Amino acid sequence: MSEALNDLAAYVKEARGSLVVSADIAYGELTLNTTPENVIALLTFLRDDVQCGFVNIIDICGVDWPQREKRFDVVYHLLSPRQNLRVRIKLQVAEDEGVPSSTPVYMGAEWFEREAWDMYGIPFEGHKDLRRILTDYGFEGHPLRKDFPVTGFVEVRYDDVLKRVLYEPVELKQEFRNFDFLSPWEGTEYVLPGDEKAKQ
């Protein structure tokens, strides 16, 4: 498998090296790093080239790195059924930077891009229907961002008396607690009975 991935990485670099910033193989998958300006050209090449044949888009997701200047990674997962290979395309974008929509290349990318917009707030330029897909109407914020509060901003519940859904500010019934998960069986400073032989 890694030989096929090495061959694919070398082929893509040779054929379209200007579109690829770097290529790595980790955990049995090839990752091609690119830029927002080059992502559509790279996706089109990977789909249309006879040697590649990545005709299926499996997923598009985001990764939030709030400490970085380019806060988000946008990650595309592609599949080539003919070669039985997967490839990951990754690019970095700032919080206020858009990514060209990949829907002209892969029709199946539409809902994946809507999900990345809904969860992270990553805008996909040229997407024809970029609206929330998982959260409720009027939802504020993007819940998979690292700076989004764990409790959220509002609590949604159904009221049996009023026979409708109510949106109320979050009211915590107890303070946040900090649990100490250290095991009493790990990290001891003293030698346990029977272990003194192992140290010799």
From Swiss-Prot:
EC nos: 7.1.1.-
GO molecular function per UniProt: NADH dehydrogenase (ubiquinone) activity; NADH:ubiquinone reductase (non-electrogenic) activity; quinone binding
Reaction(s) this enzyme catalyzes, per UniProt: a quinone + NADH + 5 H(+)(in) = a quinol + NAD(+) + 4 H(+)(out)
According to its record, how does it sit in the membrane? Peripheral membrane protein
Going by the UniProt record, its keywords in alphabetical order are:
Cell inner membrane, Cell membrane, Membrane, NAD, Quinone, Translocase, Transport, Ubiquinone
One Pfam match, given by its short name, reads: Complex1_30kDa
Q: Which family does it belong to?
A: Belongs to the complex I 30 kDa subunit family.
Protein's name in the database: NADH-quinone oxidoreductase subunit C
| Gene encoding the protein | nuoC
